[in-house]
Design a protein with these regions (language model features):
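ABC ATPase nucleotide-binding domain helical subdomain, centered on the C-loop/LSGGQ "ABC signature"
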Residues: 424, 431, 438, 456-499, ...
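Helix-to-loop junction immediately C-terminal to a conserved catalytic motif
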Residues: 413
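Transmembrane helices of ABC transporter permease
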Residues: 25-31, 158-209, 279-294
Length: 583
């Protein structure tokens, strides 16, 4: 992604409507800043009134207040001022609570929207992308990187608030003591700029390292949970716990470094502010000047410091935090900038509508001069492949492990794009009308993916409850030789099967995958070693059902056992990148 400004990057993650809302938030922040300034600036008159009431008549603010409220008695004026300050602080803090809620909802809403947009982007990336990237990277981008991006947005909001408060308070102090204010502000500004220039690269590097460690921590969890059965059988729990903990220690080291880099400025700013004010006192004492003349100035600086030091510290910490989190924002913008995804809901694939609207079509499948090489590999997996699958027939594909059988099927499915050649269905290239092709195929892999939902939801995967046709679910289950088993369950189709179907046997999981492929009544059915996990008797029953379907569907079957494909109309062998017909 080309270099973009921070503003341009933020525009990428916000829809137009939310950008307008952000502008509205800016004006709301301005109002909050005025309240914060009033809360601090009204304290000084009260302090002056308590310290030297006899000098009040010389104060411009007192004369102005006296015009509005013509009160001669100073005690009454003191009471009015106290009540006014209390009222301002009540309003200020109520408004601050309101702004906190508004900002929190704004950030949470857009955080979720951006995460959904990134998931949409990842779902639209080509299959080769997912072959080359670990799922932990995807999880990090959607969760951790998006959180970093919106932490930056939150930091910018805080920067605006504290920056405006600081400017107003500095202006206020300039009126009180010009040279002292300029001296302190100049010192703080020089220190902040120098410190930021020194630590900026270190913070960015820490942010990059943190992202890498986050991936390793997520990977340790995913691998441990994903292989929990084998892990427990082998007694290797400690390995995965130690792997996570080791990366966790590295993460702690980074956070410690960040705490040091972010914490030092806060303490030094406090030292500079206190040293500046007390330095004035020291100079006055050294010159034997009357200290009573600077009591008012000291009071003003002391009161302003209540808000000024936290604001200055927050500005410094915010700028450092933005540098640390910038790698996360950059990653989010790069994903969006790839243009793999579009706005949520626009140009989205609606498989339900396709399945309802398509007409049944029996047509030949022709693979012409097909060649394919995986990215980062030199030798082609398949070379100059030519196959014809007649409509309504079943074709078996055999070959040793790693020969390229699954790659061939992935190409015909349209998951992979060949470097040479084409695949035709009914004389039309499947890539020219891929959505129509998708609506006509059913796929049964060797390893079935199952969600921690009901049997119904797993058969009709990806559909909302109101879209599911139970009659079609039962028909698909019956065709997969699983209907009787499900009818015997207490909750029937509503039975929860656990994550990855842990409450089912291997054969039952496989048959749910078969039922899923049959739910949409596809024209072409692909079985990628789909019966490998079944016992011989069940495999024969399932294949009998598949063979019965082959009279009305085209079936392409990958298998290791020749008995699985003995009833196929044709058999092809994949060997050394070539495909030859054996029968």
């Amino acid at each position: 992604m080309e270099q973009k400004s921070l503003f341009a990057k933020l525009k990428m993650i916000f829809p137009k409507k939310e950008r307008r809302y952000f502008v509205l938030l800016f004006f709301l922040i301005l109002i909050g800043t005025v309240f914060e300034f009033l809360g601090v600036s009204l304290i000084l008159p009260l302090v002056n009134l308590l310290i030297s009431p006899e000098q009040l008549s010389d104060k411009a603010w007192y004369r102005l207040l006296n015009r509005v409220l013509p009160i001669q008695d100073q005690n009454t004026m003191l009471l009015v001022l106290v009540l006014l300050i209390i009222a301002v602080y009540i309003v200020k803090n109520l408004y601050a609570i309101y702004m906190s809620v508004v900002q929190g909802v704004f950030l949470a809403r857009n955080r979720v929207n951006t995460s959904a947009k990134l998931l949409d982007c990842f779902m639209r990336k080509p299959y080769t992308f997912h072959l080359q990237h670990n799922s932990a990277e995807v999880i990090r981008a959607i969760n951790s990187d998006v959180s970093s991006a919106y932490d930056i947005v939150s930091s910018i909001m805080n920067l605006i608030t504290n920056g405006l408060i600081t400017i107003l308070l500095i202006g206020y102090l300039v009126l009180v003591d010009f040279w002292l204010t300029i001296s302190i502000v100049t010192g703080l500004a020089l220190y902040s700029v120098v410190y930021f220039l020194v630590v900026r690269k270190k913070l960015k590097a820490a942010g990059e390292e943190s992202r890498e460690i986050t991936v390793r921590m997520i990977k340790a969890i995913v691998q441990a949970v994903g292989g929990i059965k084998e892990v427990k059988v082998m007694g290797r729990e400690r390995f995965f716990v130690d792997s996570y903990a080791e990366n966790g220690e590295s993460f702690v080291r980074i956070r410690r470094r960040l705490s040091i880099l972010s914490g030092v400025p806060r303490r030094l700013i406090e030292i500079l502010c206190v040293a500046g004010v007390l330095g004035l006192v020291a100079v006055k004492i050294a010159l034997r000047q009357d200290l009573s003349a600077i009591v008012g100035s000291l009071s003003a600086f002391a009161v302003a410091a209540i808000k000024l030091m936290p604001s200055a510290n927050s500005i410094n910490a915010t700028i450092n935090g933005i540098s640390y989190r910038m790698p996360g924002l950059n990653a989010v913008c790069e994903i969006i900038d790839d243009n793999w995804g579009t706005d949520i809901g626009q140009a989205a694939i609606d498989s339900t509508a396709r399945a309802r609207n398509r007409e049944r079509k029996q047509a030949d499948i022709r693979v012409e001069n097909l060649s394919f090489t995986y990215p980062e590999m030199d030798e082609p997996v398949l070379h100059d492949v030519n196959i014809t699958v007649k409509a309504g027939t079943s074709v078996g594909i055999v070959g040793v492990t790693g020969a390229g059988k699954t790659t061939l099927v992935d190409l015909i499915l349209g998951l992979l794009e060949p470097q040479q050649g084409r695949i035709l269905y009914g004389g039309e290239d499947i890539r020219e009308n891929y959505e129509d092709w998708q609506a006509r195929i059913g796929y049964i892999p060797q390893n079935i993916y199952l969600t921690d939902e009901s049997i119904r939801a797993n058969v009709a995967l990806g559909l909302y409850a109101e879209q599911i046709d139970d009659e079609k679910v039962w028909k698909a289950l019956d065709d997969a030789q699983l209907g009787d088993f499900v009818r015997g369950l207490k909750n029937g189709l509503d039975t929860k099967i656990g994550e990855m179907g842990v409450r089912l046997s291997g054969g039952q999981r496989q048959r749910i995958g078969i039922a899923r492929a049959l739910y949409y009544d596809p024209d072409v059915l692909f079985l990628d070693e789909a019966t490998a996990a079944l016992d011989t008797a069940t495999e024969k029953a399932v294949m009998a059902a598949v063979n019965a379907l082959s009279r009305e569907k085209t079936c392409i079957i990958i298998a290791h056992r020749l008995t699985t494909i003995e009833d196929c109309d044709a058999i092809y062998e994949v060997k050394d990148g070539l495909v030859s017909r054996q029968r």
